[in-house]
Regions:
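Conserved ATP-binding subdomain of kinase catalytic cores across diverse folds
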Residues: 23-132, 161
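Catalytic activation segment of kinase domains across protein kinase-like and atypical kinase folds
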Residues: 167-195
Length: 195
């Protein structure tokens, strides 16, 4: 197909998103309100807050531009179909979920393609509420540190055992519980792109 535009928005959030002017693909990719929380060298990541059932929730909107030629050529050289950052991230999040690895929740995403070439996209993810793994580790006792490293190793071992060669750094983990029995109870994996 010459020109293709994909858009997915969770039904439960459509009304709240439309109330701040986010209805169509273009609205998401040109959204400029909210604080920029990404480094200049990374794709734009902005925060936005919505009131859902009387509670204020924070979301991160990751916007991507046109895919660089060298990335597409590298994919073709490796006999892969060129894939945008948005499509890659949605695919990885789905893969993690399919293997019962707790991961951040995307609530909206979209991509625009011309002759199969990514011309931009976005992904909107819900904030994971908890404490950053690195901060928890720093303030933990020696016994807790050992346990945290053990379950971090358990997470990495699970990923590798299932053939998932994705980098998960300690900075990419949020501790959502103080139950350090297993990574599934304690950690949620996020994609950290902010400075």
């Amino acid at each position: 197909m010459l020109f293709e535009e994909n858009l997915y928005v969770e039904e439960a959030l459509r009304q709240e998103l439309s109330s701040i002017g986010l209805v169509c693909f273009r609205d998401f990719t040109q959204y400029s309100s909210g604080a920029v929380v990404s480094r200049p060298s990374k794709r734009d990541v902005r925060t936005l807050c919505l009131e859902i059932n009387g509670k204020k929730k924070k979301y991160f909107l990751k916007q991507t531009g046109i895919q660089h030629l060298q990335i597409a050529l590298k994919a073709l050289y490796q006999v892969h179909v060129p894939c945008s950052a948005t499509a890659r991230e949605i695919s990885i999040l789905g893969l993690f979920r399919n293997h019962d690895i707790p991961v951040m929740r995307p609530v909206a995403w979209g991509e625009r393609r011309l002759f199969g070439w990514s011309m931009g996209g976005f992904i909107l993810v819900e904030e994971v509420v908890g404490k950053e793994f690195v901060n928890v580790y720093r303030s933990a006792s020696l016994r807790q540190r050992r346990r945290l490293m053990y379950i971090y190793g358990e997470l990495m071992g699970t990923l590798h055992h299932r053939g998932i060669q994705s980098k998960v750094r300690p900075q990419d983990l949020i501790c959502v519980s103080e139950d350090y029995e297993t990574f599934r109870k304690c950690f949620v994996v996020i994609d950290r792109e902010r400075g």
